[in-house]
């Protein structure tokens, strides 16, 4: 690489000085560091560079920066010292040779130009490579680092983005003064100079080539952090109006409504005003300060996992589409905050039009929100304007975020996906864009959701309250201790790769002018949406609250002694750690006792003390609300819970029969909870879970049979209770189908809900989703897909009765009698 000496002290080093930090350079850096230590409060990306990037501090490390800046160098030094990384101002001694530990790619502009020893800089880097030639055991880790003061993308003025943002001394002074507390030190994965020397040699031409690659690396990194320049809003509207699709829609609007062309065009502009974001970097900065202050007081921590894979995709030039689950209105702010602090551009966010009220609407708009109506039906002009606006965001290179569920989950489970915006995303690809679009599934989890009380009321029939300023203020006034927050980035889905695999001829449908809907679009979008939901659940996060709620709700009296709760949490934790749900899911590293202590601090549970010990109680009024948190991780425990239910009921059962039972019920569970395994993967998963349950002492294995272990029967029963309500719901629907094979789909869903509500009252089932309309609708669709209901709508009575009998064995006799008597009473 082409490098320059950071200062003349390094020239003195090579002439025999034993310490760099002596004399004038030492005084200079100390004087410069004094104001920087006051003005600059930088953040490291990633948060803990050494472990997250796999840096080996026992091996030599040198830093590469994009351009000569002492302020950048000292900012880097502060982060290195804070994270136990080598001090960049301390030279490296290798085989008796002293070399500076940092190198600048570019000399950078100056107020007063002076000679920069470019050739000596190239020689310096060449010396690093040459040392690897003479010492085969040497392996220096070269770590590219960029330091950014502020991340304003600027406005479009016709010029292209500069490859590097180089500032002279005066400009840097004002940047530090104004943006010192909005600065980031971005560490990139290291490059092995040993590998470079072995594979490419050590001559000066290699250094020059590496310099070009490094310049490209830093330019891409800046684009990933800052994003493309922002257009003037009116210029964007003019471009949209000039598009053929909107021009045609305007003509159709004028003709169909018998209005003038000018009036139809004004209608289109009004829709653009309603939809379009008005992104403001200053609003991002201000909100970041406010949220940073707020999060630190409300949350005990925001846990982020797998962000590096997203940073790499942004660096590689992918068009990123963030697809998170939707738990709360807080999701909008939390995800943008996390992305900003991961060195990525906050995305343009598709927000429901219900949030476009004063003052939230204008604020959200400046934070990147663009607003979407609940339905596009019957308004061709609106759908065309929205689709063209979304396509324009993609073509300009802005990252986008939308909630594929279409709304917030009221139950804590993932909702069935709404595919409209996803379909438009693929249509944008069919316009022939050059940048690859990649979908990023994201799991967002909380230990406290501020709307959870409202959700419970809505599930019990209350009318949804319209979003407004008073409602927002009431919600904010209730914010107290929110515990931990979780943002887990799931496995990315590159759309081009997906289409190449599943629709090899998709490029034949590319039309740069018109939005097309080829025959393969709808089924492909449905499959992609289902896959996204699975990937979101794959990134699930277990935490103290959802684990404790799962255990306490499994108890008939919603109470356990502290010892029992500890034992149950250990069961869950060991299952999740030793047989992970997926490589992207996360499990707390804390002990069960520590998790219980943390959960008790959330003030959701009561503790009764007696002479024997503590009893932890989930109050009845809290029980309904706590099902929300249990449901967040239901998918991670449902398979071991089902196995435990089967073993508990049969007392002992062979692996083959257990496998048969699971195989019958699994398709319904997979569809309802978006489980990750295909049927052919089940035997290996069940074997792994059975072995883990044996290791825990929950069961014993004898002659290929699973036997209940009486010594740990309570723990096994509590584990089994995790599937109890799901099995009861299935039993209701299968009994109704068996009793009336010709029942139509609508009636089946309605009667299933009626019986479920009756069961809920008679048997004290507190879960609102137990009789949720969407859950039964999804179940009936799955029964049709699995062949239990024929194309004509009639059930297969022999098959449905067989499944009902299997389910009847897994539910209690009193619940079974309630189900059967309810339908007989109707007859």
Curated annotation (Swiss-Prot):
Q: Tell me which domain of life the UniProt entry assigns to the organism this sequence originates from.
A: Bacteria
Q: What is its EC number?
A: 2.3.1.15
A single GO BP = CDP-diacylglycerol biosynthetic process
> Which reactions are catalysed by this chain?
sn-glycerol 3-phosphate + an acyl-CoA = a 1-acyl-sn-glycero-3-phosphate + CoA
Q: Where do we find the motif HXXXXD motif here?
A: 325-330
Which top EC class is given? transferase
For this chain, the family text in UniProt reads:
Belongs to the GPAT/DAPAT family.
Q: What is this protein called?
A: Glycerol-3-phosphate acyltransferase
Taxonomy of the source species: Bacteria, Pseudomonadati, Pseudomonadota, Gammaproteobacteria, Enterobacterales
């Amino acid at each position: 690489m082409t490098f320059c000496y950071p200062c003349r002290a390094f020239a003195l080093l090579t002439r025999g000085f034993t310490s760099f930090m002596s004399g004038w350079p030492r005084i200079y850096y100390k004087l410069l560091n004094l104001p920087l230590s006051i003005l600059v409060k930088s953040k490291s990306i990633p948060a803990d560079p050494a472990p997250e990037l796999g840096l080996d501090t026992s091996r030599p490390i040198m830093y590469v920066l994009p351009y000569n800046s002492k302020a950048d160098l000292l900012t880097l030094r502060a982060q290195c010292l804070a994270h136990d990384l080598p001090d960049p101002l301390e030279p490296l001694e290798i085989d008796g040779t002293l070399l500076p530990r940092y190198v600048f790619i570019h000399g950078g502009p100056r107020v007063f130009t002076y000679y920069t020893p470019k050739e000596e800089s190239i020689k310096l880097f060449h010396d690093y490579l040459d040392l690897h030639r003479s010492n085969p055991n040497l392996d220096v880790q070269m770590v590219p680092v960029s330091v950014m003061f502020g991340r304003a993308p600027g406005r479009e003025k016709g010029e292209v983005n500069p490859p590097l943002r180089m500032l002279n001394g005066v400009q840097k002074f004002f940047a530090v003064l104004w943006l010192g507390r909005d600065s980031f030190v971005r560490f990139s994965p290291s490059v092995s100079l040993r590998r470079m020397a072995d594979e490419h040699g050590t001559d000066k031409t290699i250094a020059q080539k590496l310099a070009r690659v490094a310049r490209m690396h830093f330019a891409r990194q800046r684009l990933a952090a800052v994003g493309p320049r922002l257009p003037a809003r009116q210029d964007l509207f003019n471009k949209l109006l000039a598009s053929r699709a909107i021009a045609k829609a305007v003509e159709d609007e004028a003709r169909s409504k018998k209005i003038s062309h000018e009036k139809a065009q004004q209608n289109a502009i009004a829709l653009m005003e309603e939809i379009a974001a008005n992104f403001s970097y200053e609003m991002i900065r201000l909100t970041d300060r406010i949220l940073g202050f707020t999060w630190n007081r409300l949350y005990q921590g925001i846990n982020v996992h797998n962000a590096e894979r997203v940073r790499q995709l942004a660096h590689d030039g992918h068009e990123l589409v963030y697809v998170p689950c939707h738990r709360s209105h807080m999701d909008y702010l939390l995800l943008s905050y996390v992305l900003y602090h991961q060195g990525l551009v906050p995305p343009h966010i598709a927000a429901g039009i219900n949030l476009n009220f004063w003052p939230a609407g204008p604020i959200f708009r400046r934070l990147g929100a663009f607003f979407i109506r609940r339905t596009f039906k019957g308004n061709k002009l609106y759908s065309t304007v929205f689709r063209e606006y979304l396509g324009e965001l993609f073509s300009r290179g802005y990252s986008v975020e939308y909630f594929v569920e279409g709304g917030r989950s009221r139950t804590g489970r993932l909702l069935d996906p709404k595919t409209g915006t996803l379909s438009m995303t693929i249509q944008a690809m069919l316009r022939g864009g050059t940048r690859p679009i990649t979908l990023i599934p994201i799991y967002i989890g909380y230990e406290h959701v501020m709307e959870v009380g409202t959700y419970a009321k809505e599930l019990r029939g209350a009318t949804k309250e319209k979003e407004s300023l008073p409602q927002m203020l009431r919600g904010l006034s209730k914010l107290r201790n929110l515990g931990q927050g979780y943002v887990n980035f799931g496995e990315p889905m590159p759309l081009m790769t997906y289409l190449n695999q599943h629709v090899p001829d998709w490029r034949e449908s590319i039309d740069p002018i018109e939005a097309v809907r080829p025959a393969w679009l709808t089924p492909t979008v449905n499959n992609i949406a289902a896959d996204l939901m699975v990937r979101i659940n794959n990134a699930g996060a277990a935490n103290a609250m959802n684990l404790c709620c799962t255990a306490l709700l499994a108890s008939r009296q919603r109470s356990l002694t502290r010892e029992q709760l500890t034992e149950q949490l250990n069961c869950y934790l060991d299952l999740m750690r030793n047989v992970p749900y997926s490589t992207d899911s996360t499990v707390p590293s804390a002990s069960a006792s520590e998790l219980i202590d943390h959960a008790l601090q959330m003030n959701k549970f009561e503790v009764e003390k007696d002479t024997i010990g503590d009893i932890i109680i989930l109050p009845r009024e809290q029980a309904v609300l706590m099902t929300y948190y249990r449901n967040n991780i239901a998918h991670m425990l449902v398979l071991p819970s089902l196995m435990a239910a089967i073993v508990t009921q049969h007392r002992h059962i062979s692996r083959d029969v257990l496998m048969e039972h699971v195989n019958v019920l699994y398709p319904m569970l997979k569809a309802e909870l978006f489980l990750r395994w295909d049927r052919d993967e089940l035997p290996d998963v069940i074997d792994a879970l059975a072995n883990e349950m044996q290791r825990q002492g929950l069961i014993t294995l004898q002659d290929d049979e699973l036997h209940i272990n009486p010594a740990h029967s309570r723990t096994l029963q509590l584990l089994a209770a995790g599937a109890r309500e799901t099995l009861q719901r299935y039993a209701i629907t299968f009994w109704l189908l068996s009793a009336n094979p010709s029942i139509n789909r609508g009636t089946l869903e309605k009667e299933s809900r009626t019986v479920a509500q009756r069961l809920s009252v008679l048997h004290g089932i507190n879960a609102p989703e137990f009789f949720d309309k969407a859950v039964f609708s999804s179940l009936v669709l799955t029964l049709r897909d699995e062949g239990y209901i024929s194309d004509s709508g009639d059930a297969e009575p022999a098959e449905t009765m067989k499944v009902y009998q299997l389910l009847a064995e897994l539910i209690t006799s009193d619940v079974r009698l309630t189900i059967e008597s309810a339908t007989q009473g109707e007859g």
